[in-house]
From Swiss-Prot:
Keywords assigned: ATP-binding, Kinase, Nucleotide biosynthesis, Nucleotide-binding, Transferase
Classification via Gene3D superfamilies: P-loop containing nucleotide triphosphate hydrolases (3.40.50.300)
PROSITE patterns, per database record: THYMIDYLATE_KINASE
InterPro entries found in the cross-reference section: P-loop_NTPase, Thymidylate_kin-like_dom, Thymidylate_kin_CS, Thymidylate_kinase
Stated family: Belongs to the thymidylate kinase family.
EC assignment: 2.7.4.9
UniProt entry tagged with the keyword Transferase: yes
One Pfam family from the record: Thymidylate_kin
Name of protein: Thymidylate kinase
Species per Swiss-Prot/TrEMBL record: Cereibacter sphaeroides (strain ATCC 17023 / DSM 158 / JCM 6121 / CCUG 31486 / LMG 2827 / NBRC 12203 / NCIMB 8253 / ATH 2.4.1.)
Function: Phosphorylation of dTMP to form dTDP in both de novo and salvage pathways of dTTP synthesis.
């Protein structure tokens, strides 16, 4: 657990509704009087946002998987040291739209890189900082991919590099997130992301409540 605050990550396949749930949870917790910081990965700092533009745009073959991992990790170093860790030290609730679980899923399972190496790199880069709780928004891969591709249609910023990959890739990513939750149930909660946004928010709030009840925030 963060030294004083509470660190929540929201993970899931593309199109699972992470960004909307992050906003809803932030509003809900803010209404309860909690000091909430919302951030995202890759991103969260000017340097991280620049890296985001590099790795999420263009053709899939633009980056070697190892280069992709190192870029994501470089963004996370800046994010943790300049944003997440200071906010936790101030006793804030940090909600991140993606974190290291996505690296394990996309660059590990998806790209075939060693999970052990990714975990070692993460430990060195972040001081082995992991969320107090990760909410995994679970949705059929085909539904999520269709949602995500519709969202990207007409957007001026092209962040569709992963959406360009086939359904089998996204099914592997979904399985990877579920496997992470099964291995560490004390720090994960799987949320059914089907249904209305209000229904998903209610499920997420119900899963989060017992963890926050034990947190120093």
């Amino acid at each position: 657990m963060g030294a004083q605050g509470f660190f929540l990550a929201v993970e899931g396949i593309d199109g699972s509704g992470k960004s909307g749930i992050v906003r809803s949870l932030a509003a809900h917790l803010g209404a309860e009087g909690r000091d909430v910081l919302v951030t995202r990965e890759p991103g969260g700092t000017p340097e991280g946002e620049a890296i985001r533009g590099l790795v999420l745009a263009g053709a899939d073959e633009a980056w070697d998987p190892m280069a992709e991992l190192l870029l994501m990790t470089a963004a996370r170093v800046q994010h943790v040291r300049r944003v997440i860790a200071p906010a936790l030290a101030q006793g804030r609730v940090v909600i991140s739209d993606r974190y290291a679980g996505s690296t394990l899923a996309y660059q590990g399972t998806g790209r075939g890189l060693s999970e052990a190496f990714i975990r070692t790199l993460h430990a060195e880069a972040t001081g082995d900082l992991w969320p107090d709780l990760t909410l995994v928004l679970d949705l059929e891969a085909g539904i999520g991919l269709a949602r995500s591709r519709r969202r990207l249609t007409g957007e001026t910023l092209d962040e569709g590099r992963f959406e360009s990959l086939d359904l089998a890739f996204h099914e592997r990513i979904r399985a990877a997130f579920l496997a992470q939750a099964a291995r560490d149930p004390g720090r994960h909660a799987v949320i059914d992301a089907s249904g209305t946004p209000e229904e998903v928010q209610a499920r997420a709030c119900a899963a989060l409540a017992p963890f926050l009840a034990q947190a120093p925030v």
